[in-house]
């Protein structure tokens, strides 16, 4: 753990639009027996309820969603471009079917009951505050539905307090 140092949200150097949308992130959560992770490129950072927060959206079919739903904390972690292949792999296979973490080549770490990977350059440890499933009748721009939800598998939105930011 000595590679990471804790910073305040105001000290974050990365651009969240690039970090999340272009470089991707891993959403990682654990239960008593297992850790699961998935690659995500949708989400955001901000302030809500006077707290620094992250928001992510997870589809009901994603195995990681079960871990996020059943736990109090999860992490968002970000990587240098050298890890893009590993992130692509982690986003394309399910932890239900194989030990994808072992096959990814990434090194699992745990801090404060939150799991993430040693290879990350930035880690947000997040505590869930709120969740809300998307509902079809709440879409103002209904053209999004056929493009992003042809199977009606609407995301669930999670808002989480960022309790710690770790950087290398």
Report the location of each language-model feature.
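Active-site-proximal mixed secondary-structure blocks
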Residues: 1-40, 44-168
């Amino acid at each position: 753990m000595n590679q990471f140092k804790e910073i305040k949200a105001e000290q974050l150097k990365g651009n969240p639009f690039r970090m999340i949308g272009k470089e991707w992130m891993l959403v990682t959560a654990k239960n008593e027996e297992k850790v699961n992770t998935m690659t995500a490129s949708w989400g955001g950072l901000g302030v809500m309820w006077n707290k620094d927060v992250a928001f992510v959206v997870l589809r009901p079919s994603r195995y990681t969603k079960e871990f996020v739903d059943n736990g109090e904390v999860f992490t968002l972690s970000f990587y240098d471009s050298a890890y893009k292949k590993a992130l692509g792999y982690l986003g394309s296979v399910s932890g239900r079917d194989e030990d994808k973490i072992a096959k990814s080549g990434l090194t699992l770490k745990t801090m404060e009951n939150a799991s993430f990977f040693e290879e990350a350059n930035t880690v947000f440890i997040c505590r869930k505050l709120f969740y809300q499933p998307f509902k079809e009748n709440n879409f103002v721009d209904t053209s999004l539905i056929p493009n992003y939800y042809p199977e009606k598998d609407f995301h669930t939105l999670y808002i989480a307090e960022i309790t710690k930011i770790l950087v290398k």
